Amino acid sequence: MDFILKTEKLTHIYSPGTPFEHVAINDIDFAVKEGEYLGIIGATGSGKSTLIQHLNGLMKPTSGHVYLNGRDIHSSKGFTRDVRFKVGLVFQYPEYQLFESTVFEDIAFGPKNMRLSESEIRDRVLESAGFAGLDDQLLQKSPFELSGGEKRRAAIAGVIAMRPEVLILDEPTAGLDPRGRDDIIKNIMSYKLAHNATVIMVTHDMEEIARNVDRIVLFQKGSIVMDGTPAHVFSNLEALTQLGLAAPKVSLVAAKLRALGLPLPNDVITIKQMQQELRLLAPREGARNA
């Protein structure tokens, strides 16, 4: 099995040896397959953001290792720099980090730092703007003239323009309306499919993660406490409740229907799955009541 990213006994301690010492992540063994769409969930302060900042070398472990394609990302300064182009990280509310005079220049910032030619930079800006759902006419505007959703897309385009093998997003749809959230998720999927990219998404939106990811990792107090498919994770309603997390609403409705005697499987976690199961059950229930 090909793992593009892997951690080995990864630990990070903030302010070690002081009264403020805090173990953010502890002894994490974690791996992501090439092309996988991974969701990371957990309560606030569980270690999610600390983990993802290690995955592109932004933070250095207190102990342990992070590997990209089998090589320790801190094996040399040059490789650590390369990793930051290969593993793109979009922070929460990335629109607050826009700073250039035009949207074009903001998106071009990463490719320029990669020392690409002017023509290649232009090609990448236009391509990434397309993936992010930005019209060409917006590229010459100041980023501060854009709407909130457009700023978010411009910030994501700036990371996509580096064509990362791994795209990591921290709450990419936070604060957006439903249409804006759907658009961002579609944009991310378009990039993933076009470049066979690996996507890692941190989110509190359980409906979103249930619909889109291949696998979920659940963090609690700096440790991984659950790792599996969305169906596996969201069928453990009692465990999620104990961890202070809400399951997708469809999972909760399905559980109530099962309690009333309806034979729904435990892995119903999306509206589409619920519709399919209810259609299958309708003839049986009709025959039973005839």
Task: Identify what each model region corresponds to.
Residues K221-G222:
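Conserved ABC ATPase "signature" C-loop
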Residues S142-L146, E150:
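Conserved ABC ATPase signature
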Residues R163:
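Conserved catalytic motifs of ABC-family nucleotide-binding domains
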Residues S119-Q137:
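Conserved ABC ATPase "signature" region
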Residues H65-D82:
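ABC ATPase NBD Q-loop/coupling interface
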Residues L167-D170:
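Catalytic Walker B motif of ABC-type/P-loop ATPase nucleotide-binding domains
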